[in-house]
């Protein structure tokens, strides 16, 4: 009998297991893959402050590179460049980072089983590909796969290739906006170091494989090292994180950012909060304590995620012509102001700045108004 079984050896799942085991309880992590950390779906962007809050100190293996600037391109080829030095953003190797957290969880006493799939819940535990396991609590960290039957409109197809190319700039992330090619999202280039980078595309109902190939051909010569196809979730947190003895964490709970689908920090904190709350419920023999996990996560991220969802609604409703006009309205002062921000994970104010609407309704003439006005009002 385990105190908790966690399905999914993701960062969120491993952090959940770490906190449960840290408190002296037994936790079992089920990972369906052959190893923790693979395949590497994530772009790997995270701030040093976020990693510190997650209790992770980067090793030489898990650190790839440091990001100094972000270059954002409009559909007609204009661009702005933002100094991101103050945000202290790094690119991490998710395969190694997840293994690092797996070692933390194991050192506290958690058990990790690879090549083991979760098949379903049974009265006293869970059914797995390696037999039934009894447990008191079940934690769903299976990622976007858990959301497929909840709301398909919130799931975007994504392709990310790891490539070697001489056009990848060290220390610079590139974002390409194009509502015709990547509706509701964008293409990106994230440098990993030594001429290697992660190149990806995502958007509503796109043919990700074809579009990433077109993007790469347009960029120049390249060699593909690895191909990853994985959906992302962009609709924010699900309605409830807990039901009876089941706890949902990470991407499965919709805890990735609605704007970029990034979730190392927000999903990781979800894992820590869930693990601590489960430990408290076990210690007090009171499963009603589980609701504290959801309350804590929403208190930390709820307001920011609501604003990011509003920003997403606005951005999904504008066309390329409008995006180009917005780029024309961005002033050096706006860029300097955004560059001065030091928080990578709570970034709605920067989005408002980029829309050119802080303190005015000029851009409202280009957009359909209710969400925009609400977004502006949340910025004070």
Task: Identify what each model region corresponds to.
Residues 1-12:
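Beta1/beta-strand and adjacent pyrophosphate-binding region of the FAD-binding site
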Residues 4, 17, 25-27, 138, ...:
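Hydrophobic anchor at the start of a short beta-strand
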Residues 7, 21-41:
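Glycine-rich FAD pyrophosphate-binding loop
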Residues 9, 103-224, 238, 254:
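Predominantly flavin-linked oxidoreductase catalytic cores and closely associated redox partners
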Residues 33-55:
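Conserved N-terminal glycine-rich FAD pyrophosphate-binding loop of Rossmann-like flavoproteins
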Residues 205-283, 291:
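FAD/FMN-dependent oxidoreductases across multiple families
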Residues 279-380:
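C-terminal helical "tail/cap" subdomain of flavin- and related membrane-associated enzymes
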């Amino acid at each position: 009998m385990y105190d908790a079984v966690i399905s999914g050896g993701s960062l969120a799942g491993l952090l959940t297991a770490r906190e449960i085991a840290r408190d002296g309880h037994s936790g079992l992590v089920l990972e369906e893959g052959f190893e923790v950390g693979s395949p590497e779906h994530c772009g790997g962007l995270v701030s040093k402050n976020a990693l510190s809050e997650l209790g992770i100190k980067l090793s030489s293996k898990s650190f790839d590179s440091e990001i100094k600037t972000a270059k954002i391109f409009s559909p007609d080829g204009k661009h702005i460049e933002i100094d991101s030095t103050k945000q202290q953003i790094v690119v991490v190797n998710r395969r190694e980072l997840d293994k690092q957290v797996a070692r933390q969880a194991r050192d506290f006493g958690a058990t990790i089983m690879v090549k083991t799939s979760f098949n379903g819940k049974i009265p006293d535990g869970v059914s797995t590909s390696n037999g039934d396991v009894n447990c008191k609590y079940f934690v769903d960290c299976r990622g976007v796969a858990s959301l497929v039957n909840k709301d398909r409109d919130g799931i975007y197809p994504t392709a990310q290739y790891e490539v070697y190319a001489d056009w990848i700039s060290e220390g610079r992330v590139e974002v390409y906006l194009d509502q015709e090619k990547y509706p509701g999202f964008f293409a990106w280039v994230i440098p990993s170091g030594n001429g290697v980078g992660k190149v990806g595309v995502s958007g509503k109902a796109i043919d990700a494989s074809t579009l990433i190939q077109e993007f790469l051909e347009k960029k120049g010569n390249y060699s593909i090292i690895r191909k990853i196809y994985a959906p992302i979730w962009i609709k924010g947190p699900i309605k409830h994180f807990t039901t009876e003895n089941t706890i949902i964490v990470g991407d499965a709970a919709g805890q990735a950012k609605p704007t970029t689908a990034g979730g190392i920090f927000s999903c990781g904190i979800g894992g820590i909060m869930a693990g601590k709350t489960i430990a408290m419920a076990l210690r007090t023999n009171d499963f009603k304590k589980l609701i504290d996990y959801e309350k804590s996560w929403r208190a930390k991220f709820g307001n920011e995620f609501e604003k990011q969802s509003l920003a997403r609604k606005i951005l999904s409703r504008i066309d390329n012509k409008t995006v180009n006009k917005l780029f024309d309205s961005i002033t050096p002062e706006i860029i300097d102001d955004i560059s001065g921000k030091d928080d990578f994970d709570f970034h709605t104010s920067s989005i408002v700045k980029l829309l050119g609407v802080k303190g005015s309704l000029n851009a409202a003439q280009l957009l359909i108004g209710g969400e925009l006005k609400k977004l502006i009002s949340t910025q004070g």
